[in-house]
């Protein structure tokens, strides 16, 4: 249960409160000037930590497959860690008016729904592992959150709304992958009582 990939996933979860403290610290760390734009140092530090934590998603999966250490615990914990990290970041982005609340609500609602689906089916002995659309969704969310945490830099220097477009792509894949999880598991869900 506590093999290397699962320990990496647990480390990702442990980084979430540190990320939140950096982002929500009640003091001003100053701003970093980039051309005509600027970004709060706390947001830059938070973005770097978020990107590091997000990268562990790839690392734990790589080692799980390479070392043949894929476990049901890991199949459950890995997507949960992703959801916790991304949800914490999205809520903070809303607080700083860097993301529209309705988009964050759509993303987090889907995450709760799919987690609920996984929990119900786990009670019947079925494990709902991440599929390709779910993985694309996760990376789309990570890219969007990273770009938003960075205040759209460096794209802001050329007035290209990369962060906004990335968030729209993330919402799209969030909804589509959620639909796929439920449609593929609907029969199992109906017979789970």
Swiss-Prot record:
It is found in: Cell membrane. Pfam families: CDP-OH_P_transf (PF01066). GO terms for cellular component: plasma membrane. GO terms for biological process: glycerophospholipid biosynthetic process; phosphatidylglycerol biosynthetic process. Pathway: Phospholipid metabolism; phosphatidylglycerol biosynthesis; phosphatidylglycerol from CDP-diacylglycerol: step 1/2. One of its GO terms (molecular function) is CDP-diacylglycerol-glycerol-3-phosphate 3-phosphatidyltransferase activity. Disulfide bonds: none annotated. The keyword Transmembrane helix applies. PROSITE patterns: CDP_ALCOHOL_P_TRANSF (PS00379). Keywords: Cell membrane, Lipid biosynthesis, Lipid metabolism, Membrane, Phospholipid biosynthesis, Phospholipid metabolism, Transferase, Transmembrane, Transmembrane helix. The chain crosses the membrane at residues 8-28, 39-59, 88-108, 157-177. It comes from the Bacteria. Its EC number is 2.7.8.5. It is a multi-pass membrane protein. It catalyses: a CDP-1,2-diacyl-sn-glycerol + sn-glycerol 3-phosphate = a 1,2-diacyl-sn-glycero-3-phospho-(1'-sn-glycero-3'-phosphate) + CMP + H(+). This protein catalyzes the committed step to the synthesis of the acidic phospholipids. Belongs to the CDP-alcohol phosphatidyltransferase class-I family. NCBIfam families: pgsA. This is CDP-diacylglycerol--glycerol-3-phosphate 3-phosphatidyltransferase. It comes from Bacillus subtilis (strain 168).
């Amino acid at each position: 249960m506590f093999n290397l990939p699962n320990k990496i996933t647990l480390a990702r979860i442990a980084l979430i409160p540190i990320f939140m403290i950096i982002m929500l610290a009640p003091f001003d760390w100053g701003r970093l000037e980039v051309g005509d734009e600027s970004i709060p140092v706390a947001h830059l530090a938070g973005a770097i930590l978020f990107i590091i934590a997000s990268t562990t998603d790839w690392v734990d999966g790589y080692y799980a497959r390479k070392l043949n250490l894929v476990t049901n615990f890991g199949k459950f914990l890995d997507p949960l860690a992703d959801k916790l990290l991304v949800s914490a970041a999205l809520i903070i982005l809303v607080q700083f008016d860097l993301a529209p609340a309705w988009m964050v609500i759509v993303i987090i609602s889907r995450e709760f729904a799919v987690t609920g689906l996984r929990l119900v089916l786990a009670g019947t002995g079925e494990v709902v592992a991440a599929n390709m659309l779910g993985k694309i969704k996760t990376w789309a969310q990570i890219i969007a959150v990273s770009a938003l945490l960075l205040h759209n830099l460096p794209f802001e220097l050329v007035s290209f709304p990369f962060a906004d477009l990335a968030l729209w792509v993330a919402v799209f894949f969030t909804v589509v992958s959620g639909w796929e999880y439920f449609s593929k598991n609907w029969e199992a869900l109906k017979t789970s009582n």
